[in-house]
Design a protein with these regions (language model features):
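Aromatic- and carboxylate-enriched substrate-binding clefts and catalytic-loop regions
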Residues: 53, 58-254
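Intrinsically disordered, low-complexity coil segments
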Residues: 11-31, 47-50, 76-79, 92-102, ...
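Active-site mouth loops of central-metabolism enzymes
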Residues: 3-21, 26-37, 132-147
Length: 254
């Protein structure tokens, strides 16, 4: 939903500039960001995203991207510790108010399946909820019980796909290996997509950013070996791998 979230917020900002009405939460143009574009109305409303894409829905997972488990206006640069709860936010999805975390996820998945999708999928922050940098950073081996519980929630809801993206441990190969193997043990049907945030792999050297695009020499041979070694290591244990990105125009379709 990340691209759709961007489109929604872009339209709201345009409407604000033209003096047109927008939802209450979107009225302060200084606060809203792409993360704020996902909620019950945009997903399940009369013109919600869950109703789009016709017959291909039965073969596709519907991924709720960054924002589904935090309140509005949250930013990792300001308060990264609020990310990673895995609890469908009731301000964004008021129908789940009063439900347990696992029941919220089941409600979400059931709604998506009822709309013709193969199932629901979740964007996941690569960190434990409440964690922070420095003294509050928690090692991968000390997070196992937390992740067992979150995997159990998804198992209860029959959510079978996680996109594990940015977070305090996003560049930590050991963390990604721990989580991937734990999911395989606790809930084998759960696909872990290791979405590794990195510069384009074919021109990490001599890279420039201009007019909204990346430019570089385009040669994989010029990429530092240690960077490619890290990608190789993640690929060894990954069911699914995503890198940002492999060529000059940054997308999230690799």
């Amino acid at each position: 939903t990340w691209g759709s979230q961007s489109n929604v917020i872009g339209r709201y900002k345009d409407r604000i500039k033209r003096g047109k009405p927008v939802p209450d939460y979107a009225k302060d143009i200084t606060k809203i960001s792409q993360r704020d574009g996902i909620n019950e109305e945009t997903v399940f409303g009369e013109k919600g995203w869950a109703k789009n894409w016709g017959d291909i829905r039965k073969d596709c997972y519907f991924i709720l991207d960054d924002g589904w488990d935090v309140g509005y206006y949250e930013r990792p640069a300001v308060n990264i510790s609020v990310f990673g709860s895995h609890i469908l936010n009731e301000t964004r999805f008021p129908s789940v108010k009063g439900m347990s975390p696992q029941e919220r996820l089941k409600w979400l998945n059931d709604k998506l399946v009822a709309n013709g999708w193969l199932g629901g999928a979740l964007w996941i922050s690569a960190q434990k909820f409440g964690e922070n940098y420095g003294r509050n950073k928690i090692s991968a081996e000390n997070q196992i019980e937390f992740w067992k519980e979150r995997i159990a929630w998804s198992k209860y809801a029959n959510i079978r796909y996680w996109k594990v993206d940015w977070g305090i441990h996003c560049l930590d190969v050991g963390f990604r290996k721990m989580l991937t193997k734990l999911a395989a043990k606790e809930f084998p049907e759960l696909i872990i997509e290791n979405a590794y945030p990195a510069l384009p792999a074919n021109f990490i050297n001599n890279i420039q950013f201009k007019d909204g695009k990346y430019f570089g020499d385009g040669k994989f041979a010029n990429t530092p070996r240690k960077e490619l070694d890290k990608l190789d290591e993640i690929l060894e244990f990954s069911t699914l791998f995503r890198t940002y990105d492999t060529y000059g125009n940054s997308v999230t379709l690799d």
